[in-house]
């Protein structure tokens, strides 16, 4: 069955004023759809066509050379955006609680230190890419960034939330003011969903 564009769990205008409706609609229906289409075109008729996108992206280095570029770019784009939509919510913001909050405190020096590190990762990613909070194979948290549509899955880590810092994610509202966009993102993070992903990654 071909990969499909996931429906958003909220309306395009639900994250206003932090992320505008026009950006959300274009980002979802145009950019993400393009990644889905590109991935399907690349793997159609192959033994990997039925693989979940996360498994496919995680195994990209084991794929034939002829497929690696498309799976990295289009598969990575599909996986990254599929996660991105779910870790935002109109009821988002604030700080994490529970086991995730405890892990951030013990492993990353607390929420303020985490926020500083994550903001730096997003700000200093030159050109297009992502900032991530991921879980390593050793089950520890790490703040990292990746270029283009590379995913932490390609390097053995499990992303539990990420911020898209491609210009298409913010330029209509924020133009070149990436720091302002990053600051706005903290107001829509769905920490309950991030913790759910954290606990899943620990299994």
Swiss-Prot record:
Q: Which cofactor does it need?
A: Mn(2+)
Gene3D superfamilies membership: Fe,Mn superoxide dismutase (SOD) domain, Iron/manganese superoxide dismutase, C-terminal domain
Report the EC code(s) recorded for this entry: 1.15.1.1
InterPro entries attached to this UniProt entry: Mn/Fe_SOD, Mn/Fe_SOD_BS, Mn/Fe_SOD_C, Mn/Fe_SOD_N, Mn/Fe_SOD_N_sf, SOD_C_sf
The entry lists its GO molecular-function terms as: metal ion binding; superoxide dismutase activity
Q: Which UniProt keywords apply?
A: Manganese, Metal-binding, Oxidoreductase
**Which Pfam families does the protein's record reference?**
Sod_Fe_C, Sod_Fe_N
Q: Which reaction does it catalyse?
A: 2 superoxide + 2 H(+) = H2O2 + O2
Would you name any one GO CC term? Answer: cytoplasm
Q: Which residues bind Mn(2+)?
A: 27, 81, 164, 168
Cofactor detail note: Binds 1 Mn(2+) ion per subunit.
Query: What SUPFAM superfamilies does its record include?
Result: Fe,Mn superoxide dismutase (SOD), C-terminal domain, Fe,Mn superoxide dismutase (SOD), N-terminal domain
Q: How does it assemble?
A: Homodimer.
The UniProt entry's sequence similarity note says: Belongs to the iron/manganese superoxide dismutase family.
Q: What does this protein do?
A: Destroys superoxide anion radicals which are normally produced within the cells and which are toxic to biological systems.
Can you say what this protein is called?
A: Superoxide dismutase [Mn]
Q: What is the native source organism of this protein? A: Pseudomonas putida (Arthrobacter siderocapsulatus)
């Amino acid at each position: 069955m071909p990969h499909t564009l996931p429906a958003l769990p909220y309306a395009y205008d639900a994250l206003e004023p932090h992320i505008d409706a026009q950006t959300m609609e274009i980002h979802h229906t145009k950019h993400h759809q393009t990644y889905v289409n590109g991935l399907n075109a690349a793997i159609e008729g192959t033994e990997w066509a039925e693989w979940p996108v996360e498994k496919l992206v995680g195994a990209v280095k084991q794929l034939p050379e002829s497929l690696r570029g498309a799976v990295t770019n289009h598969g990575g784009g599909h996986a990254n955006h599929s996660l991105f939509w779910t870790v935002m919510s109109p009821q988002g913001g604030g700080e994490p609680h529970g086991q995730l909050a405890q892990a951030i405190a013990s492993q990353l020096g607390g929420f303020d230190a985490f926020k500083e590190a994550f903001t730096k990762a997003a700000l200093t990613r030159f050109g297009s890419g992502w900032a991530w909070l991921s879980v390593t194979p050793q089950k520890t948290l790490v703040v990292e960034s990746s270029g283009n549509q590379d995913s932490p899955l390609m390097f053995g880590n499990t992303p539990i939330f990420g911020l898209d810092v491609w210009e298409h994610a913010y330029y209509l509202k924020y133009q070149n003011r990436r720091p302002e966009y990053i600051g706005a993102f903290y107001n829509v993070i769905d920490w309950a969903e991030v913790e759910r992903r954290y606990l899943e990654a620990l299994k």
